[in-house]
A protein has these predicted regions:
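Outer membrane beta-barrel
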Residues: 44-67, 86-237, 252-270, 308-310, ...
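C-terminal beta-signal and terminal closure region of outer-membrane beta-barrel proteins
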Residues: 470-501
Length: 506
C-alpha cells in the first residue's frame, strides 16, 4: 500500500513538473505591424501595413439651407423656381457626406496615385403642378413618405489614377482653372469659364520646371460639355415657353473633346491658358434615318485665367479671374450648373398682359430641316476678391457675366418659330434671341476652429434679354408651373438668393 501510494504521488509530481517547465518555455511572439506615418506626400498619409503604399482618408460633412431657390445652390431661373408662385420652394435644405481615398506609391517611373471621392446627398423635395386644365388643377409633391429615398443620391465625384505623367479616369477638366466656377463663391451658377464637374479623360501632363506645366487631353463631352443642338423645325409652343428653341437633336458620341492647357503656378500666383475643340454631331432631321441629317461641325473654346496671391490689402488675400470665348462649345463659358433654358416670371405694366417673362436659350448649334448647323457664340468673364479680416473671418465679393449671340441665319430660324408659334407682337423686327446672363454676390465665412466653417452667401442674378421692350407673346397653359395660357410681356428679370452653410472637413 505504501509502495503504491508512493508511486502515485511520484507520478503526479512528475507530470506537474513537466507542465510547469513547458509553460515556462519561451515562445516567439508574432511580429506586430504598427501603422507608420508616411511623410513623403504631406500630412495625413500612413503606410498600409505590409506595403510601400501610402494612404490618406478625408472628406467632409456639409449642411446647407438655400433661400429663394429650388436648388442648392443655383439661380431660380427655370421650372417652378422661375415661376415665382406658390409652387416654388421658399427654402431648400441639403445634407451631404463626402469620403475621399488617396493612395500613393513611389515607383521607378515616378509616383503612382489613385484617387476616389464619393458623396451621399439628401435634398429637400419640390412641388410640381399636375393639373390638366386651368379649372381642374392639382398639385402633387414629388416625393411621398413611402418614396422619400428618391430625394437622396449617391455621386461619384472623382475616380482616376496618375502614373508617369498620365491621368486616366474621372478628374477635373484640364480646360478649367483651379478654382473652376468658384473664384470666391459658393454659388454654383457663375458664367465666365469652365466648370467644376469632373469628366472622364485621358491626359498627359508635362512638368517643365519652375512651376510651368502643359497638359494635352481627350475628354468625354457627353455628360457635361454639350448644351443643346436644336432643330428649330421641331419647336413647339410648350417648348418655346420654357426657352427651348427647338427639338434637341443630339446624336451619339462621335469624338471626345480635345483640350490643351499651359499653366504657370509660382509664389506670386497663377496664369493659365486653355483651348478646347468640341464636335457637334446632330442626329436626323425627322423621325428616321431616311430623312437625312446636317453635317458635323467642330466648335472651339478658349480661356485665360489669372490668380494673384498675397496682395497688399492683407495676408492671404487673393484675386481670381478668368475670361472665356466659345463658338459651338458653349459649356466652356456657360458651365454645366447654369440652366440651358431660362424662363423667369415677374410683374408687368403692359395692358392686357397677365405677367412678364424672360425667355432665353443656350445652344451649341441650331438648324432647320434640310440645312446645316449654325454655331452659337458666347463670351464672358468672372472674378472674385477675397479679403481676410482675421484668421477666423474672410469675405469675398464676386461676379460673372456671359453673353450668348446667334448669327443672322440662326436668328431667322428661331424668330420664324417665335413669331409664328407664340404670336410675338413686335414681329420679326422685335425678335432677338440673344441674351446676357450675370450674377454678383457677397460671401462671408467664419472658421471658429480648424476645418469647421460657417458661411453666408447672397447672390443677385440678372437676365438681360434682347427682345424689343414692351413686346408680348402668347404662351400656352403650363400646368407644371401653374401658369395660365395668356399674353406675357417679354422683359428682363432678376432674382435674389441666399445660401447658409456649415461644413466640417476632416
Amino acid at each position: 500500500m505504501k509502495l503504491t501510494m508512493g508511486l502515485l504521488l511520484g507520478s503526479v509530481a512528475m507530470f506537474a513538473s513537466a507542465g510547469i517547465h513547458a509553460a515556462d518555455l519561451p515562445v516567439k511572439a508574432k511580429a506586430v505591424e504598427y501603422v507608420k506615418i508616411c511623410s513623403l506626400y504631406g500630412a495625413g498619409f500612413y503606410y498600409i501595413p505590409g506595403t510601400d503604399t501610402c494612404i490618406k482618408l478625408g472628406g467632409y460633412l456639409r449642411v446647407s439651407l438655400a433661400l429663394g431657390t429650388n436648388g442648392v445652390y443655383g439661380a431660380p431661373d427655370s421650372g417652378v423656381a422661375g415661376a415665382r408662385n406658390r409652387i416654388r420652394n421658399y427654402y431648400t435644405s441639403q445634407s451631404r457626406g463626402d469620403l475621399n481615398i488617396d493612395t500613393r506609391t513611389a515607383t521607378e517611373y515616378g509616383m503612382l496615385r489613385t484617387y476616389f471621392e464619393a458623396v451621399n446627398t439628401w435634398s429637400t423635395g419640390g412641388y410640381t403642378g399636375a393639373g390638366t386644365s386651368a379649372i381642374n388643377g392639382s398639385t402633387a409633391y414629388t416625393t411621398s413618405i413611402a418614396s422619400q429615398i428618391s430625394a437622396g443620391s449617391l455621386g461619384v465625384y472623382y475616380a482616376f489614377f496618375q502614373f508617369a505623367g498620365f491621368t486616366i479616369g474621372k478628374a477635373q477638366s484640364q480646360f478649367a482653372s483651379p478654382w473652376t466656377n468658384y473664384p470666391g463663391n459658393n454659388f454654383d451658377g457663375l458664367p465666365g469659364g469652365g466648370g467644376w464637374e469632373p469628366v472622364n479623360q485621358f491626359t498627359y501632363t508635362a512638368e517643365l520646371g519652375q512651376g510651368i506645366s502643359a497638359a494635352f487631353s481627350a475628354q468625354d463631352q457627353v455628360a457635361n460639355l454639350t448644351s443643346n443642338i436644336w432643330n428649330v423645325s421641331g419647336a413647339t409652343a410648350a417648348g418655346l415657353a420654357t426657352g427651348a428653341y427647338g427639338a434637341n437633336d443630339i446624336g451619339g458620341s462621335r469624338a471626345p473633346d480635345v483640350v490643351a492647357m499651359v499653366r504657370v503656378a509660382q509664389a506670386w500666383g497663377l496664369f493659365q491658358a486653355s483651348v478646347a475643340a468640341h464636335e457637334n454631331h446632330a442626329a436626323y432631321y425627322g423621325a428616321d434615318e431616311t430623312t437625312g441629317h446636317p453635317s458635323d461641325k467642330w466648335g472651339w473654346a478658349g480661356q485665360l485665367a489669372l490668380s494673384i496671391k498675397n496682395i497688399p490689402t492683407g495676408a492671404g488675400d487673393t484675386i481670381n479671374m478668368s475670361i472665356a470665348y466659345t463658338n459651338g462649345a458653349s459649356r466652356y463659358n456657360f458651365q454645366e450648373y447654369i440652366s440651358s433654358t431660362v424662363a423667369m416670371y415677374g410683374g408687368t405694366g403692359v395692358p392686357g398682359a397677365y405677367q412678364s417673362v424672360g425667355l432665353a436659350g443656350l445652344s451649341d448649334s441650331v438648324f432647320v430641316t434640310g440645312s446645316g448647323q449654325q454655331l452659337t457664340t458666347t463670351y464672358g468673364f468672372q472674378g472674385a476678391y477675397t479679403h481676410n479680416w482675421s484668421p477666423q473671418w474672410n469675405s469675398a465679393i464676386y461676379g460673372g457675366w456671359g453673353a450668348v449671340r446667334y448669327n443672322n441665319t440662326a436668328k431667322s430660324y428661331i424668330c420664324g418659330a417665335v413669331v409664328t408659334t407664340l404670336a410675338l407682337s413686335s414681329g420679326l423686327a422685335g425678335c432677338n434671341p440673344d441674351y446676357n446672363y450675370s450674377a454678383v454676390g457677397l460671401i462671408t465665412r467664419w472658421t471658429p476652429v480648424n476645418n469647421l466653417t460657417f458661411s453666408a452667401d447672397v447672390t443677385y442674378v440678372m437676365l438681360d434679354q434682347k427682345y424689343t421692350s414692351g413686346s408680348t407673346v402668347t404662351l400656352p397653359l403650363q400646368s407644371s408651373v401653374a401658369k395660365p395660357g395668356a399674353a406675357y410681356e417679354l422683359k428682363d428679370q432678376n432674382a435674389l438668393t441666399l445660401l447658409l452653410r456649415a461644413q466640417r472637413n476632416w
